[in-house]
Swiss-Prot record:
It comes from Human immunodeficiency virus type 1 group M subtype F1 (isolate 93BR020) (HIV-1). Keywords: AIDS, Host cytoplasm, Host nucleus, Host-virus interaction, Methylation, mRNA transport, Phosphoprotein, RNA-binding, Transport. This is Protein Rev. Asymmetrically arginine dimethylated at one site by host PRMT6. Methylation impairs the RNA-binding activity and export of viral RNA from the nucleus to the cytoplasm. Gene3D superfamilies: 6.10.140.630. Its main location: host cell. The gene is rev.
Length: 116
């Protein structure tokens, strides 16, 4: 694991082992009994899986010092996006297709959404 010290690698592997044990301690329920009994067992199993997932997230975040999930990418507002069609409009050229640019000024692509 690049960029880490050996100690933190060992701690991370230990945390992964703990998480694996947690998931192995909650096997999927057997398909026996009445429909209602099976449904109840699956419902309880899903609740335990949810708890295990939350515990696993807490273990990983304490081990890594940050959340396990990546930070979502911030996208620019839609009002600033437009398709640049000034060079090759209607020619069918491949290089003009799908090229969107962000401009400094605001272009209205669609109306305000109200019907007139």
């Amino acid at each position: 694991m690049a960029g880490r010290s050996g100690d933190s690698d060992q701690e991370l592997l230990k945390a992964v082992r703990y998480i694996k044990i947690l998931y192995q301690s909650n096997p999927y329920p057997k398909p026996e009994g009445t429909r209602q009994a099976r449904r109840n067992r699956r419902r309880r199993w899903r609740a335990r899986q949810r708890q295990i997932r939350e515990i696993s997230d807490r273990i990983l975040s304490s081990c890594l010092g940050r959340p396990a999930e990546p930070v979502p990418l911030q996208l620019p507002p839609l009002e600033r996006l437009h398709i640049n069609c000034s060079e090759d409009c209607g020619q069918g050229a491949e290089e003009g297709v799908g090229s969107s640019q962000i401009s400094g000024e605001s272009h209205t692509v669609l109306g305000s959404g109200t019907k007139e």
